């Protein structure tokens, strides 16, 4: 009986390893397929927004993204600013004003400032672009943690669930670190999401590319441990991942 038990345990362990290997292989294939779809042939276009972007970008989006960011700012639909120049002074309010299930690109420009809020983009907010003034200029920050009776998944300072989401030139922070355990700063769920020239600062589990197709380009991540976790088919181009002292 003891020998049978050992054999059964061994078979169970082998099955678990095979299942895990199959899952990892499947994810690797998805990531490789996405990587192949992104052309890097022409490095002279690095100053453009997501040059030679993923094949799943629409023709209209590719045309818009070949504009430089200053041109994009001039075609915004909503302006967020802490002074009187903006349509709104709260990022969440501006996002709420964006149309649901939009078939065309809707652009929100967030001017230089520090915005202390939890930003959540619902799954009905599709084809939304957020563009800002730079990683050191436009900062979205909060201090929610798992010690606030929240699952780590729900601690994100910024969470986007809508498909076709694009964000450019901003910084995201979760300032609970290091005293309150693992938290998330940026969580991305929506399919065909692009994060370009953005910065994330965190202590643990900073970036959560949860699922679907995602592309990160010229992205800066500062963390101490468990930098990136998630199940997305995500590609990282020209990114920096920096370890900071805990």
UniProtKB/Swiss-Prot annotation:
Keywords on record: Aspartyl esterase, Glycoprotein, Hydrolase
Annotated site location: Transition state stabilizer: 204
One example of a Gene Ontology biological process annotation: pectin catabolic process
Enzyme Commission identifier(s): 3.1.1.11
One Pfam family cited in the UniProt record for this chain: Pectinesterase
Active site positions: 205 (proton donor), 226 (nucleophile)
Superkingdom per UniProt: Eukaryota
UniProt keyword Hydrolase, yes or no: yes
InterPro entries associated with the record: Pectin_lyas_fold, Pectin_lyase_fold/virulence, Pectinesterase_cat
Gene3D superfamilies for the chain: Single-stranded right-handed beta-helix, Pectin lyase-like
Pathway where it operates: Glycan metabolism; pectin degradation; 2-dehydro-3-deoxy-D-gluconate from pectin: step 1/5
Enzyme class of the recorded protein, top EC level: hydrolase
GO molecular function: pectinesterase activity
Residues holding substrate: 152
SUPFAM superfamilies: Pectin lyase-like
Sugar-modified residues: 127, 143, 174
Reactions catalysed according to its record: [(1->4)-alpha-D-galacturonosyl methyl ester](n) + n H2O = [(1->4)-alpha-D-galacturonosyl](n) + n methanol + n H(+)
Function: Acts in the modification of cell walls via demethylesterification of cell wall pectin.
PANTHER family in alphabetical order: PECTINESTERASE (PTHR31707)
Protein family per UniProt: Belongs to the pectinesterase family.
Protein's recorded name: Putative pectinesterase 57
Source organism of the structure: Arabidopsis thaliana
């Amino acid at each position: 009986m003891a020998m049978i038990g050992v054999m059964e345990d061994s078979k169970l362990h082998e099955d678990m390893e095979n299942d895990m290997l199959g899952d990892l292989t499947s994810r690797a294939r998805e990531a490789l397929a996405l990587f192949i779809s992104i052309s890097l042939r022409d490095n002279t276009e690095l100053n453009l927004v997501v040059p030679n972007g993923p094949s799943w970008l629409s023709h209209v989006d590719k045309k818009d993204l070949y504009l430089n960011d200053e041109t994009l700012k001039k075609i915004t639909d909503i302006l967020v600013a802490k002074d009187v120049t903006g349509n709104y002074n709260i990022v969440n309010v501006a996002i709420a004003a964006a149309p649901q299930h939009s078939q065309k690109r809707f652009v929100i420009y967030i001017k230089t400032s520090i915005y202390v809020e939890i930003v959540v983009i619902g799954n009905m907010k599709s084809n939304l672009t957020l563009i800002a003034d730079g990683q050191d200029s436009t900062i979205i920050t909060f201090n929610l943690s798992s010690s606030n009776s929240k699952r780590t998944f729900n601690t994100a300072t910024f969470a986007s669930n809508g498909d076709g989401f694009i964000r450019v030139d901003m910084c995201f922070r979760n300032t609970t670190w290091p005293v309150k355990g693992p938290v998330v700063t940026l969580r991305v769920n929506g399919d065909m999401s692009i994060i370009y020239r953005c910065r994330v600062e965190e202590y643990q589990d900073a970036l959560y590319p949860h699922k679907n197709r995602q592309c990160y380009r010229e992205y800066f991540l500062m963390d101490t441990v468990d930098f990136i976790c998630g199940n997305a088919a995500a590609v990282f181009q020209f990114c920096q991942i920096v370890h900071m002292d805990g």
